[in-house]
């Protein structure tokens, strides 16, 4: 049976890609999930795996082609039925059929009904002014002898000059909208129009975490050849808090009109790249340690900035986290990634003088902002979730570096 290999959505709202490699040739066998093409978009360079197993009977794209969603790229015969069709060849446009010439027959304007004939693809007559023109499929009645009308010669119309291009207004310049920027814009509008957010901000005492991180980074350098970022600890604390508040790891299913709670916690990490925002995700973060999460953050960020992110990295995210603090910002109003339920933002940590045990002390304070879908959770729910995240950070619950 012939199966069409079509270009599917590569994620992040991008609808086209450029073929950079073809990994098989006609006649080769291929397995399910084996890569057949490599496609580059404005955000990712990704392999396209085959959804079918069988023999490749046609490859309908070339290296350098730009393909769009739904476009057939190859044909794979799984051997279950008729052989796959040969590769489609470019079809020359058929020569236009000769247009029959009819001599207009002067006749009075009529309102007679259209006449239909059996077997005619298009039937009847069109009444135009005082002449009758047959339609294909209907045999015209015999014309009455009449002198041909005299056509008066007319002079060729004077072509209208094209309007001159409008000059750019003084003091302005234009910036072309890239495919990636357009995709980001569409995603933001979709989220903003469909998800009414409730947003709360918390102050978290991260003093103990700061001290703990300083004490273990020597170990992390010697054992893992890396320091553990604060962001990795924050992500781990959020994942821990979701155990008590799983609704924030859910999504609304509009077709079934219900909330779906995801078993896996796939944490989307907002990465600022030279070309724009991209949100790959850490898969099954609920099974990972702080060190594992730290490694994933570094890996995803590096590959996002070098356009080496793969399709699976962008799909199936369940909750997102962004770090305003990396830019020195404390607060913001993050936009929830549709169709997720929640996004958590961490701000720039600051040393602050606070009251402590009858006196004052200097504490490290983390601003933490949560935006959640107000259709399905209330501000009080967000408040309890935020307090649980704060507790995880302040008490160093399950944040050990081993």
Curated annotation (Swiss-Prot):
Gene3D superfamilies per the UniProt record, alphabetical: 2.40.50.100, Chloramphenicol acetyltransferase-like domain (3.30.559.10)
Active site positions: 374
Chain positions with N6-lipoyllysine modification: 43
Start and end residues of each stretch annotated as Disordered: 82-110, 143-172
InterPro entries: 2-oxoA_DH_lipoyl-BS, 2-oxoacid_DH_actylTfrase, 2-oxoacid_DH_E2_comp, Biotin_lipoyl, CAT-like_dom_sf, Single_hybrid_motif
Molecular function in Gene Ontology: dihydrolipoyllysine-residue acetyltransferase activity; lipoic acid binding
EC number(s) per entry: 2.3.1.12
Cofactor(s) essential for the protein: (R)-lipoate
Keyword Signal: no
UniProt KW Transferase keyword: yes
GO CC entries: cell surface; cytosol; membrane
Limits of the Lipoyl-binding domain: 2-77
Pro residues bias (residue ranges): 87-107, 143-162
Cofactor note as given: Binds 1 lipoyl cofactor covalently.
Keywords attached to this entry: Acyltransferase, Lipoyl, Transferase
Reactions it catalyzes: N(6)-[(R)-dihydrolipoyl]-L-lysyl-[protein] + acetyl-CoA = N(6)-[(R)-S(8)-acetyldihydrolipoyl]-L-lysyl-[protein] + CoA
Entry function: The pyruvate dehydrogenase complex catalyzes the overall conversion of pyruvate to acetyl-CoA and CO(2). It contains multiple copies of three enzymatic components: pyruvate dehydrogenase (E1), dihydrolipoamide acetyltransferase (E2) and lipoamide dehydrogenase (E3).
Family the UniProt entry places it in: Belongs to the 2-oxoacid dehydrogenase family.
Subunit (UniProt): Forms a 24-polypeptide structural core with octahedral symmetry.
Name under which the protein is recorded: Dihydrolipoyllysine-residue acetyltransferase component of pyruvate dehydrogenase complex
Organismal lineage: Bacteria, Bacillati, Mycoplasmatota, Mycoplasmoidales, Mycoplasmoidaceae
Gene: pdhC
């Amino acid at each position: 049976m012939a199966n069409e290999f079509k270009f599917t959505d590569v994620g992040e709202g991008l609808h086209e890609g450029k073929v950079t490699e073809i990994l098989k040739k006609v006649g080769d066998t291929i397995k399910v999930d084996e890569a057949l093409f490599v496609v580059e978009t404005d955000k990712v360079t990704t392999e396209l795996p085959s959804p079918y197993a069988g023999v490749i009977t046609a490859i309908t794209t070339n290296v350098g082609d730009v393909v769009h969603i739904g476009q057939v790229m190859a044909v794979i015969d799984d051997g279950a039925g008729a052989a796959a069709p040969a590769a489609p060849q470019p079809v020359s446009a058929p020569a236009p059929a000769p247009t029959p010439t009819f001599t207009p027959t002067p006749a009075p304007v009529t309102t007679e009904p259209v006449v239909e004939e059996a077997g005619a693809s298009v039937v009847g007559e069109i009444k135009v002014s005082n002449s009758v023109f047959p339609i294909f499929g209907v045999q015209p009645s015999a014309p009455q002898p009449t002198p041909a009308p005299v056509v008066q010669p007319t002079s060729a119309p004077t072509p209208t000059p094209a309007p001159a291009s409008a000059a750019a207004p003084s003091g302005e310049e234009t910036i072309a909208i890239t495919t990636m920027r357009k995709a980001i814009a569409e995603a933001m509008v979709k989220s903003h129009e469909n998800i009414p957010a409730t947003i709360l901000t918390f102050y978290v005492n991260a003093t103990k975490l700061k001290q703990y991180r300083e004490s273990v980074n020597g170990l992390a350098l010697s054992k893992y050849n890396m320091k553990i970022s604060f962001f990795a600890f924050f992500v781990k604390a959020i994942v821990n808090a979701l155990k008590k508040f799983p609704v924030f790891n859910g999504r609304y299913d509009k077709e079934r009109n219900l909330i779906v709670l995801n078993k896996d916690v796939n944490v989307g990490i907002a990465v600022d790249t030279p070309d724009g925002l991209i949100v790959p995700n850490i898969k099954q973060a609920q099974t990972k340690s702080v060190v594992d999460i730290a490694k994933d953050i570094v890996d995803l960020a590096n590959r996002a900035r070098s356009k080496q992110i793969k399709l699976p990295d962008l799909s199936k995210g369940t909750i997102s986290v962004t770090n305003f603090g990396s830019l020195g910002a404390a607060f913001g109003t993050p936009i929830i990634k549709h169709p997720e339920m929640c996004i958590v933002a961490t701000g720039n940590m600051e040393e602050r003088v606070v009251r402590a045990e009858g006196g004052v002390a200097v504490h490290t304070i983390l601003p933490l902002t949560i935006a959640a879908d107000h259709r399905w959770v209330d501000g009080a729910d967000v408040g309890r979730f935020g307090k649980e995240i704060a507790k995880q950070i302040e008490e160093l619950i399950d944040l050990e570096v081993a």
